[in-house]
């Protein structure tokens, strides 16, 4: 399987700093082509959310350089991958918490990580950044770790009510601000001629699922230039509708 990758980010209308961080890397190995994409949405006082998100991104990048090659040589066993990723989350939860204690600032970050090969994708999720699969239809591959998502699951809110709920952005946990962090894991078989997309919550609040599909479906995402242009068009639509948050989106096109 081959991949085309593209990503873009925008500070948005009101923030002084961009607290989102992302990384997307493609590797060629004996296991075939592999892409690792990670997106983090930081939060914290005095713009220190960017410290939390960048810290976690660097940890995943370091892992991809030093541990991932061995995992690939061993056949990318799912339990071994989750063990590595759990260690990254645990270590950096403590690291960011300690930084916060030293500086007197509360900070933390969400994270969605996607590792995709020709035969399998693996996703880690903490918080409300998301992963989508866009093919003949659009599907959310992650579950938000938020108060409103929990309320929807319990039948106390409808999805439409959740979009207007003042608790919409209240997280159940995040890396650096929780005593312990339990990531959610998802995996599946990647589809050819599909788009795998990661986004921060600022990207999706002001646009509909139908609009995401209209701009980011595989027929519209034929090369990296088209991909970036279409993602930027949706970001501009977000801003026209007065989205106040930072906005980040990463796309991986399979073929």
Regions found by a protein language model. Give the residues of each.
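PP2C/PPM-type serine/threonine phosphatase catalytic domain
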Residues: 1-255
């Amino acid at each position: 399987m081959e991949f085309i990758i593209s990503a873009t980010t925008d500070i948005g209308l009101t923030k002084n700093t961009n607290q989102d961080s992302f990384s997307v890397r493609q590797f060629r190995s004996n296991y075939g082509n592999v892409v690792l994409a990670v997106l983090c949405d930081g939060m914290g006082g005095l713009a220190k959310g960017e410290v939390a998100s960048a810290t976690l991104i660097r940890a995943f990048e370091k892992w991809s350089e030093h541990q991932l090659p061995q995992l690939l040589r061993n056949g990318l066993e799912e339990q071994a991958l989750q063990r590595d990723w759990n260690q990254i989350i645990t270590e950096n939860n403590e690291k960011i918490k300690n930084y916060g204690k030293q500086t007197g600032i509360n900070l933390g970050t969400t994270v969605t990580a996607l590792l995709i090969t020709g035969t399998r994708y693996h996703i880690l999720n903490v918080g409300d950044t998301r992963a989508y699969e866009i093919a003949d239809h659009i599907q959310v591959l992650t579950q938000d770790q938020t108060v409103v998502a929990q309320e929807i699951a319990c039948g106390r809110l409808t999805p439409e009510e959740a979009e207007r709920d003042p608790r919409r952005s209240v997280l159940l946990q995040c890396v650096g601000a929780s005593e312990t962090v339990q990531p959610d894991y998802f995996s599946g078989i990647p589809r050819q001629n599909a788009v795998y997309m990661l986004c921060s919550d600022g990207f999706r609040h002001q646009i509909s699922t139908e609009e995401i599909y209209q701009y980011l479906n595989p027929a519209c995402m034929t090369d990296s230039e088209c991909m970036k242009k279409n993602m930027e068009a949706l970001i501009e639509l977000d801003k026209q509708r007065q989205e106040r948050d930072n906005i980040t989106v990463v796309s991986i096109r399979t073929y």
